[in-house]
Amino acid sequence: MKSILLLFIIYFSSIITLSSKSPFEAYLQTKKYLYVWSYPNSDNFVKFVTQHNFTRVYLYCGCIEWDYDKLSKGNLYDSGDKDAKLLIQELISKNIEVEIAIYLNDSPNDFSNVEKMEDVAKAMGELQKTLKFKALHFDVEPSSASVYPKLLQMYENARKYVPVSAILKPGWLYKQLEDVKGKFDEDYYAKFQQCETLVDAIMLVSDYSELMAYDYRYSTIERFLNDYDVIRKRHPSHEGKPVLELDPNIVEEGISAEFKKDNTKFFEFLENVSKKFDGVTIHNYKSWNLDLYCFKPSSNSEYYFGEPKQCE
C-alpha cells in the first residue's frame, strides 16, 4: 500500500512540476534553430546558443558578389570577432549542427554570376570533409519568375558537391509551376513536369528547406505552415522547417506586437510548431537578443541570460 501511495505522490508531483513550468522554461526545452548574420562577441554568442538550447545554427559566411575569391578557395567570411571555421568547430564540439549560409548577389533577381556558385559549392564540399558542417544554406529569394529556372539549376549543380539547404518564400507555396512554364527551356521543364508548385520543384533539387514565415499574424503563419506541411509530405526524403521572425521595430501588429504585450502566446506557438515540424528556426540572433533582453549584442556587451525583460 505504501509503495502505491508513493507512486501516486511521484506521479502528481511530476504533473505539478510540468504545469508550473514558465513559458520561458518551456521555450528553453523546445527544439529550435537560430539564424546568425553576425556575432560581435563570439564568447557571448556561444553562451547564448548553448544556454538557450539551440541545436542548429545557420551561420552567414559570405556571398558570391563580394566574397567569391575567398569562398571558391574553401575559405569563409568571418562575420564576427572569431575565425568562422574555429567558431563552427566550437559549435559542433558542443553538438550544435551548423549550416553555412551564403547568398548570390545583393540584388535578389541578379543571377548574372550564378555559374560561380558551382565553384563555391565544390570548394564547400571539400571543406565539409574536414569541418563536418551539415549543409550549404542558400539565402536566395528572387521575386522575378524569369530566374526561377536558374534558381533550380543552381541548386541542382551545387548538390553534386554538397547537401543543399534552400530558403522558401511564402508566396512560392502558391506559385503554380505550370504558370511559369514559359520561363523554362522545354527540356529542362520536363524534369519538373510532375511538380505542382515552385516549392515542389525546389524540394526536388535540394535536401533541406526553410519557409520564411516572417512577422505576420498568427492566423496567417498557421495557414502558411499548414500548406507547407502538405507540400512537404509529398517529399518524404526532404527535411523542411519553418522560420519565425520577430521584428523588434514592429509595434502595431503581427507576432512581434503580440510578443511585446505578452510573450506567453509566442512561446506556446513556438513549442507547437516545433512539435509539428520536429524543430523550428528563429530569425535572427541579434533581433532575438533584442526582443528578449532589450539590447543588441555588441563586441563590448556583457552577457545576459534569464527570463525575458519587459522592453519599454
Set out the residue ranges of the language-model regions.
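Substrate-binding cleft of secreted/luminal carbohydrate-active enzymes
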Residues: 214-219, 240-312
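Aromatic-lined substrate-binding rim segments of carbohydrate-active enzymes
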Residues: 59, 64-102, 145-166
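Acidic (Asp/Glu)-rich catalytic clusters
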Residues: 46-53, 81-95, 126-131, 198-204, ...
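Active-site groove signature of glycoside hydrolases
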Residues: 58-63, 123-150, 281
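Boundary/entry segment of secreted carbohydrate-active catalytic domains
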Residues: 20-55, 60, 102-108, 166, ...
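Structural preference for beta-strand elements that scaffold enzyme active sites
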Residues: 29-35, 55-58, 97-101, 133-137, ...
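Aromatic-lined carbohydrate-recognition surfaces of secreted/lumenal glycan-active proteins
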Residues: 33-37, 97-108, 152-194, 239-255
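Short, acidic/polar
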Residues: 36-51, 112-129, 187-202, 224, ...
